[in-house]
Amino acid sequence: MTLQLNTIALLLVILLILGVLSNNSAITISAAVLLIMQQTFLSSHIPLLEKYGVKIGIIILTIGVLSPLVSGKIQLPDLSGFLSWKMALSIAVGVLVAWLAGKGVPLMGEQPILVTGLLIGTIIGVAFLGGIPVGPLIAAGILALLLGKI
């Protein structure tokens, strides 16, 4: 087996290092898996990840978000809780964020080079600003809004 030293491999190594330095396991694991896939016989499966990866990731994320409700750790509020201004605002923010993320996915497909910038920005936000790495889709939606794609 020979290593393929190219710009994508270098980018994945940089993302791997940044993921480790920023204690971002999602970036670290993702970069490591993709680097291993790129450098081995598994490279033939990368198109499957490209086609279904975001959809599978959203499904897993949704399962993770709904799990505390199913396990009973989070209770549904009573009717008065649903009618409060805080609940109305949280629903509105949830709708806005879901809409933005929905607009970000096509932008990421149309201009995949922007994904690199979004990931670097996410890593910087996690490493230096105490952020949490859940924002690339929403960041892409905000970018689409700023670029006039919406």
UniProtKB/Swiss-Prot annotation:
One family name in Pfam for this protein: DUF441
Domain of life: Bacteria
Predominant place of localization: membrane
GO terms for cellular component: plasma membrane
Cell compartment(s), UniProt: Cell membrane
Keywords of the record: Cell membrane, Membrane, Transmembrane, Transmembrane helix
Membrane-related topology note: Multi-pass membrane protein
TM segment ranges: 1-21, 52-72, 81-101, 123-143
Matches recorded under HAMAP family: UPF0756
Family: Belongs to the UPF0756 family.
Protein known as: UPF0756 membrane protein NTHI1233
Lineage: Bacteria, Pseudomonadati, Pseudomonadota, Gammaproteobacteria, Pasteurellales
